[in-house]
Amino acid sequence: MADWTGIQKKAIAFRDARDWKQFHNPKDMALSLALEAAEVLEHFQWKNGEEMEEYVRSHKGEIADELADVLFWLATMSNDLEIDLFKAFETKMKKNEKKYPVSKSKGKHTKYTKL
């Protein structure tokens, strides 16, 4: 299993070997990230619980491909913007812990402003 640095290096090497960095500005990378996330969503649109379980079982490889595309854009964008994504994740989780204390949010899907 690759670590995050390995994933970033592989994504950057793939991009750079094709001379695509010229097309990778923050706006277009963010758009590509959103588009790939939307492709993940397409797999679940209009399916109820039973349909979804069967669909996931029979389309797991396709869903994995789309999630990997999302990971590609996270890796390249965070690299180019010099954002340590693991550090950003830790910082964000600390903020979320304050916004959603277990004592107020456990078992609820309410937004933090309504707790």
Which residues fall in each region the model found?
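Flexible "arm" and connector segments at domain edges
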Residues: 1-67, 71-115
